[in-house]
Design a protein with these regions (language model features):
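Cysteine endopeptidase catalytic domains of the caspase/legumain-like
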Residues: 2, 26-303
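Bacterial N-terminal signal peptides
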Residues: 14-24
Length: 303
């Protein structure tokens, strides 16, 4: 073999070795996708300054806490925070995010924001209420001629996106959804110190007919959801039961959603894959926290 042939062979081996090293990383990154929404500064929306709106919370802190942890686990990140997290932007982002999902992907969706009971108009809820996420530009109350709830994202609408994603990633993939909101909370209470309580959500339902909200008492900690042979399995973590309030907690001088805090704490050592055992650990940690004695997380899964 001549010198040139030896050089070509050496080059081929080097290129092959390099590809063997970097290709798994490309596949790993492409196979793990995360989309996060975190809203803190609801009061900064000047377009809603003339109405009684939502109190500020600390949803952006949750996103800032989780993103580095997810990146370390190989996830590509898409996020919307504060004024970026309008209803239109969330919808467009969920659509574009779902279009990127591929067979076998592990998908993580996270929502840290207010939540609100929303009057059910299609009759699919036995108690007459849907649950809705509250984007940055959603009003708290119905206003004739101005706002009819179009910026709320109901659980029915969210489920449409989830079904699309589950179909795209297929049975070889998996979908996680973390909802650190609340649909039965009251309002902000106290000053920001160790003894204060920041509550997400409201106990006032959104209703065009002025219907009074009465929460359904469901004490199940684990709920079975739809399963299909052509869909990815799904696991949904919710911060509390439908009749409870979702309290933020303070750690190292910062406020976080309690569910987000313990999801991050758990994922610092647990692998985020198709094994959902880590979600049970999150539930255990929250139940052990004396600050959350009146709050019980809920796990919904197709497994």
């Amino acid at each position: 073999m001549g010198i040139i042939d030896k050089q070509k062979t050496t080059l081929r081996i080097a290129v092959l070795g390099l590809l063997m090293v970097i290709l798994p990383f490309f596949g790993y990154s492409q196979g793990k996708r995360a989309f996060l929404v975190g809203i803190s500064n609801y009061s900064s929306n000047q377009q809603l300054a003339d109405v009684k709106g939502w109190n500020d919370i600390h949803g952006e802190n949750d996103v800032n806490l989780l993103v580095p942890t997810l990146i370390k686990q190989g996830f590509s990140i898409q996020k919307l925070c504060n004024r970026e997290a309008t209803a239109n932007n969330i919808r467009k982002s969920l659509t574009s995010f779902s279009e990127k999902c591929k067979s076998g992907d592990i998908v993580y969706l996270h929502f840290s924001c207010h939540g609100q009971p929303f009057e059910d108009y299609d009759g699919d809820e036995s108690d007459g209420w849907d649950e809705a996420l509250v984007p940055f530009d959603a009003l708290k109350e119905y206003q004739q001629g101005r706002y009819s709830g179009e910026n709320h994202i109901t659980d029915d609408e969210l489920n449409t996106y989830l079904k699309t994603i589950r179909n795209r990633v297929g049975p070889k993939g998996f979908v996680y959804v973390v909802i650190d909101a609340c649909h039965a909370g009251s309002s902000y209470r106290g000053d920001e110190n160790e003894d204060s309580v920041v509550i997400r959500g409201t106990d006032k339902g959104f209703s065009k007919s002025n219907k009074q909200y009465a929460p359904r008492i469901d004490k199940r900690g684990k709920i079975k959801v739809e399963k299909s042979a052509n869909m990815a399995n799904i696991c949904i973590l919710e911060a509390c039961r439908s009749y409870q309030v979702n309290s933020e907690i303070c750690a190292d001088g910062k406020y976080y959603g309690s569910l987000s805090f313990y999801v991050n704490k758990t994922l610092l050592s647990a692998k985020l894959d198709k094994n959902i055992s880590w979600t049970e650990r999150v539930s255990q940690l929250m139940n052990q926290d004396t600050r959350l004695v009146r709050q019980n997380p809920v796990i919904e899964t197709s497994l």
